[in-house]
């Protein structure tokens, strides 16, 4: 089994997926990792909406593409989308949701699944039809979309990692 550091160093954003849905137990492990992310004052503001329904997934993709001004699938064909929302009442909700997404990406890597953080959840989830959808899920409160994590089996190989840029660490001793 890979160490945590090995997982962090091997993870890449997957931009091409097979249409095979990951096993439910693996998706549940990814969600569990997200739920255990650190959060400001332990408010646990993020909520994860795991979407495996193809019709909803395709609507999310279409609306995300419209916000981006693109015609292609911004979810790269991934069959599962995990929408991370967060309660806006928590002062650290954006940071908390970001940590949730990070934990989930690392969990996907450990399980041999590909993942990619897709932006524009804020804009899509602010649309009236998606605000109503959030309410229909039984989520009380006011939520903001933090990010979408697409998850699936990679279709193809990964390129070698790019070197890290210099000058990004300063030690004060």
What are these regions (language model features)?
Residues 1-173:
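Acidic, surface-exposed loops and disordered segments
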């Amino acid at each position: 089994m890979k160490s945590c550091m090995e997982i962090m160093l091997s993870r890449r954003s997957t931009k091409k997926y097979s249409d095979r849905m990951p096993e439910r137990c693996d998706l549940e492990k990814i969600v569990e990792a997200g739920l255990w992310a650190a959060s400001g004052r332990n408010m646990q503001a993020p909520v994860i909406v795991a979407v495996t329904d193809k019709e909803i997934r395709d609507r999310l993709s279409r609306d995300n593409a419209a916000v981006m001004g693109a015609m292609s699938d911004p979810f790269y064909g991934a069959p599962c989308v995990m929408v991370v929302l967060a309660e806006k009442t928590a002062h650290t909700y954006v940071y908390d949701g970001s940590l949730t997404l990070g934990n989930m990406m690392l969990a996907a890597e450990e399980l041999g699944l590909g993942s990619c953080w897709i932006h524009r959840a804020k804009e899509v989830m602010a649309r009236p039809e998606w605000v109503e959808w959030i309410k229909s899920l039984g989520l009380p409160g006011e939520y903001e979309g933090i990010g979408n994590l697409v998850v699936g089996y990679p279709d193809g190989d990964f390129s070698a990692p790019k070197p890290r840029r210099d000058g990004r660490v300063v030690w004060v001793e």
